Each structure stands twice: as C-alpha cells, then as structure tokens.
C-alpha cells in the first residue's frame, strides 16, 4: 500500500477576490516576515505564512525580495 500525498495551496482570502494573485503573494510574504520578526525565526506559527507565499509567489520574486531585505531596500512594510 502506497502512502497518499495530499497537495494543498494557500486558502482563499476575502481580501483578494480576483484571480490576479500578485498582491496576495506579496502580502503573504510580508506577513511571514512580520511574524518571524515578532515571534522568532523558529516559530511554528509563522510556518503557514511561509507555505502560502511559497505556493503563490514565483521563486525569482522571492529571491529578489530576500536580496532587497538584506540590502535594506525592500519596498514593503516589514
């Protein structure tokens, strides 16, 4: 008997009713980093936000945002 893998993505969010999920992606990225700032890098509470932004955001965007955060030029409110 094989183990079944259950695939999940970010749940629907009433703040983002349209099919364009760019803003949803950016918001989840910011929520994750705000959570880790408030609760620490190892907080399990923040892991859901990480799963959401990883499911919604293209990897290139995340890489760029991470570089911007490190250099202090990230445009969002963290």
From Swiss-Prot:
Disulfide cysteine pairs (residue numbers): 25-57, 35-46
| CHCH domain sequence ranges | 22-65
InterPro entries named among the record's database cross-references = COX6B-like (IPR048280), CX6/COA6-like_sf (IPR036549), Cyt_c_oxidase_su6B (IPR003213)
Spell out the subcellular localization from the entry: Mitochondrion
* Primary localisation category: mitochondrion
Q: In which tissues is it expressed?
A: Specifically expressed in roots.
Q: Which PANTHER family match?
A: CYTOCHROME C OXIDASE SUBUNIT 12, MITOCHONDRIAL, CYTOCHROME C OXIDASE SUBUNIT 6B
**So what family is this one in?**
Belongs to the cytochrome c oxidase subunit 6B (TC 3.D.4.8) family.
What is the name of the protein in this document? Cytochrome c oxidase subunit 6b-2
């Amino acid at each position: 008997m094989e183990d079944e893998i259950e695939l999940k993505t970010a749940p629907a969010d009433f703040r983002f009713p349209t099919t364009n999920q760019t803003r949803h992606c950016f918001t989840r990225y910011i929520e994750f980093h705000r959570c880790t700032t408030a609760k620490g890098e190892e907080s399990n509470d923040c892991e859901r936000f990480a799963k959401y932004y990883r499911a919604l955001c293209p990897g290139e965007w995340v890489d760029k945002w991470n570089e911007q955060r490190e250099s202090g030029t990230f445009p969002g409110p963290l």
